[in-house]
Amino acid sequence: MWDNDFCVDFTVSLTAASLDTKMEVRNTGDKAWDFQAALHSYFDVSSLKNIEVAGSFAGATYLDKMLDPPSDQTEAREALTISEEYDRVYKGVNDCTLKDSGKGKALAINNNAGWKDTVVWSPYGDEGMGFDSFLCVESAAFDAQTLEGGASWVGELSLVPGGL
């Protein structure tokens, strides 16, 4: 399937305060290769109309994958709301908070290492997918990561629940 030597370890730790993940990608061969990675996290929400994704989005460059062809844009908003089909890669935005006023809860998405970008995706309007009951907020390493022979890359994520 892929002719490069590698090993991937994925660790999940659950405490009273957070859910923590660590993904380690190791090049176990001699030749360098590139890879991309993302954690496709689908979060249960009360309704998209109650959702805000807060973070350092204002001024950030994002790849709008809904455009044909996809192109880079600049985000004007500090907090994101979803009212249409959405597929964007926010480059350099690695921490954010998912706020759900319908549940009165918030979830801090803290990318502690490796994950440099955030992907926000919603199939808004697709009833068959239950679009109004979830939002995908992915921790990503969108640009190619190069691993030399024997080298490794680590991505660490903490999900910390809280109130509004």
Where is each model-derived feature located?
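Acidic, contiguous internal or C-terminal segments within carbohydrate-active enzymes
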Residues: 1-35, 39
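Beta-strand residues in well-ordered beta-sheet regions across diverse protein folds
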Residues: 22-24, 54, 138
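Beta-strand-rich recognition/accessory modules
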Residues: 85-164
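Active-site/ligand-binding surface loops and adjacent short beta/alpha elements
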Residues: 30-117
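Solvent-exposed alpha-helices and their adjacent loops that cap or buttress functional pockets
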Residues: 3, 45, 128-129
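Beta-strand elements of well-folded, non-transmembrane domains
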Residues: 12-16, 25-29, 41-47, 141-143, ...
